[in-house]
Amino acid sequence: MCNVKKLLLVILICLPALTFAQDVTNSKVVATLRFQIFDKYLIIPATVTNSIDTLHFIFDTGAEITTFNQETAKTLKLESKEMAGMSGTDDVVINVPISTISLLYLAKTRIPFVKVYLENLTQFKGSPVRIDGIIGVDLLKTFVVTIDYEHQVMQLYRAGKTPPEVKGKRMPLALNFKTPVIEAMISLPDGNTIANRYHFISGGEYGILFNWPFVEKYHLNTLLPITNTDKVQDLFKVLTYTNTTVPFLAMGAHRVEQVPASYSKDVDDASSITEVAGAIGYFVWKQFRSITINYNERELFLEK
């Protein structure tokens, strides 16, 4: 009995040290990736199990699934025995082959058994490097991610509590299905403001992309001045976007002036549970020195 008491005493004494050790471990950067920026997309290097060649993935927080270039899959002899549906901005679903990457290496760390949807990523042909895939949520679920725009590096910490050295002001994060969501407020030319929820999209080629039901509800197509229009090829068809400017966007303690915004009648990336106004993209996030995303703890840190 005496030995049991001694053992319990030792465990109680060691618990704070063990807890501290866990915190210290989580504070350690497990990988540092130097990224390139192409056409508002962040490109990070990676390797896979059966190849020594460096692959290049677009990192996009809005990517609920990981896509992989069909040409790269053929080169790596990545087999596919299943089909699954995926959709674009216009919500048209197409069936594509799927496969699994046994180990995806990111510098000195890795993600095991990454399910990938095989697609021809022809829209990135102008990139300085071949785009081999697009990854988002699979990376966010595995690591706490810091995007350092000032030095163009991405730092990865093991998933867990946000490391104490992370800089910036905290904002709560929510999820719409698997996509990160934040609260934000826009101003209108008449001085009125509208607060709502927005998808947090690191790779968006825009400042704000409004969902059409939100545009209709608040008459943004008449209240906001029209700059011009663009035609963009989506997965299945060409979409027409109307471009405008929002006087300012406020997110927590931060405010960004003169934000370019767009909308299209074909865009409605909304939630079935609560209203989502749209998405906030790269033009806004590049205004910050760094951004840290703790997907599992539902936290976002913005450093100006």
Regions found by a protein language model. Give the residues of each.
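Bacterial Sec-dependent N-terminal signal peptides
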Residues: 1-27
